[in-house]
């Protein structure tokens, strides 16, 4: 690894030598965000389900019960909810009807995103 400036070297050393506590707290925060997402969806968005996660901060949401086409779902997520999630379509035909959301963010932002998803599905 080539670090050319002193500040970068000091930051790198601090991360390796003193970053364990931050790392562990960040992992716990993301774990709680995953639980928050699962509970929020179960309580507020009954036509959406969350796929159990296997070691990442990217959560798959299943929108099949909404009856929306992949195109309509993408349109509502982008234009109505003003969110940029990963459309399942980019992963192939079997990804249609799914969206992937990053939950490694402040919980207030995650809640706002989930509120927006809930609002675009009202009345279906």
Outline where the language-model segments fall.
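PLP-dependent class I/II
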Residues: 3-124
């Amino acid at each position: 690894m080539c670090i050319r400036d002193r500040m970068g070297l000091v930051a790198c050393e601090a991360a390796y030598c003193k970053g364990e506590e931050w790392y562990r707290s960040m992992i716990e925060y993301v774990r709680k965000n995953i639980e928050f997402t699962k509970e929020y969806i179960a309580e507020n968005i009954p036509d959406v389900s969350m796929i159990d996660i296997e070691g990442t901060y990217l959560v798959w949401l299943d929108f099949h019960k909404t009856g929306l086409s992949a195109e309509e779902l993408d349109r509502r997520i982008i234009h109505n909810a003003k969110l940029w999630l990963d459309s399942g379509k980019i992963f192939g035909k079997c990804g249609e009807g799914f969206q992937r959301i990053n939950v490694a963010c402040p919980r207030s932002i995650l809640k706002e995103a989930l509120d927006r998803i809930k609002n675009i599905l009202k009345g279906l």
